[in-house]
UniProtKB/Swiss-Prot annotation:
Active site as annotated: H233 (proton acceptor)
InterPro entries the record matches: Hexapep, LpxD, Trimer_LpxA-like_sf, UDP_GlcNAc_AcTrfase_non-rep
Annotated S-S bridges: none
UniProt entry keywords in alphabetical sequence: Acyltransferase, Lipid A biosynthesis, Lipid biosynthesis, Lipid metabolism, Repeat, Transferase
Native organism: Helicobacter pylori (strain HPAG1)
Subunit structure: Homotrimer.
Coiled coil stretches, renumbered: none
Pathway field: Bacterial outer membrane biogenesis; LPS lipid A biosynthesis
GO MF annotations in UniProt: N-acyltransferase activity
Gene that this sequence comes from: lpxD
Protein name: UDP-3-O-acylglucosamine N-acyltransferase
Length: 336
């Protein structure tokens, strides 16, 4: 699609000089000369210097930072312009839904009844697909994988060897991403990335792992994920990490290896948790966490020894307050 057609179709008002063929939307550091990117925060301006993007949505006040080789597409709201443009690159679940039927052409794979498989799907030997599984176009499944009933794999999801996914889990659905108009209306960002799950991963029942805006949501080798977990777009879970039930990871959370998330932990987006760190149940994480540390606490999570001191201090003060209250009541009683 030509740049002029893209801007016209999605009502994006800006000026341009070179009407090039646009292939995709991409991150600044991964873009090619036929890609468009955007900058919505000043901290990303430093990426312009080495970016190969053909054009970038950007505010006028920051447009002087754009290299001459790249077109500055000046708009009031770069995030909104990007959201509108993303609709041109939406990838269908089934490109030809009328032609989808129960599969018959996979060798050395056990596929039970009522499984729906799209076009261009690859499934490795000795994999087992239970009833009710739905596999969208372009999915790649390695050897010795097990998909339990009603698992759904969205388009272009990749499972490496020895992956087990339990019933009802959804891998590769759209992330929760929206831009906002001046009136507060929400404009959906079409997520055109994928989910990649490396080998020897096990995922519990009714867990959701969202596809990336672009690039990959990545679950690395040996990760174990419990039931009822939500993993947002563009997250990266390090090797052999453990995620216990009802954890919620906001978009672009990344971790080192062997991180442990206790039950019901919530973590804000664009944060990093260092390797071998453990986070106690119900903790709320709002900042980067260093490696080789234990954290606990509701709001916010803190180093576990601090949390224990905090609880002790809270308990001591509460007891003192109770004693003071009782003494005051006793004094009042005897005065009367």
């Amino acid at each position: 699609m030509k740049l002029s057609e893209l801007l016209s179709t999605y009502s994006i008002e800006t000026e341009f000089s070179n009407d090039f063929e646009v292939h995709a939307l991409a991150e600044l550091d991964k873009a090619t000369p036929n890609d468009i990117s955007y900058i919505d925060q000043a901290r990303y301006l430093k990426l312009l210097k080495d970016s190969k993007a053909g054009a970038v949505f950007i505010r006028k006040k920051e447009s002087s930072k754009v290299p001459k080789r790249m077109q500055a597409l000046i708009v009031d709201n770069p995030h909104l312009a990007f959201a509108k443009a993303s609709h041109a690159f939406k990838i269908p679940f089934f490109k030809n839904p009328e032609s989808v039927s129960e599969p018959k052409h996979f060798k050395k794979v056990t596929i039970m009844p009522n499984v729906m498989i799209g076009e261009g799907v690859e499934i490795g030997e000795n994999s087992l697909i239970y009833p009710g599984v739905v596999i969208a176009d372009g999915v790649k499944i390695g050897k010795n994988c097990v998909l339990y009933p009603r698992v759904i794999l969205y388009q272009n999801t990749i499972l490496e060897d020895n992956v087990t996914i339990h019933a009802g889990s959804v891998i590769g659905g759209d992330g929760f991403g929206y831009a906002h108009t001046a009136l507060g209306e929400h404009v959906k960002i079409e997520h055109v990335g994928i989910v990649r799950i490396q080998k020897n991963v096990e995922i519990g029942a009714n867990t959701a792992i969202d596809r990336a805006v672009f690039g990959e949501t990545l679950i690395k080798e040996g990760v174990k994920i419990d039931n009822l977990v939500q993993i947002g777009h563009n997250c990266v879970l390090g090797e052999h990490s453990i995620v216990v039930s009802q954890v919620g990871l906001s978009g672009s959370t990344t971790t080192g290896r062997n991180v442990v998330f206790g039950g019901q932990v919530g973590i804000g987006g664009h944060l990093h948790v260092g390797e071998f760190t453990q986070i106690g149940g119900k903790s709320a994480v709002g900042k980067d966490l260093p490696p080789n540390t234990n954290f606990a606490g509701a709001i916010p999570a803190m180093e576990i020894h601090e949390w224990h001191h905090f609880l002790a201090h809270l308990r001591t003060n509460f007891r003192k307050q109770q004693k003071t209250s009782l003494l005051q009541k006793a004094k009042g009683f005897f005065k009367s």
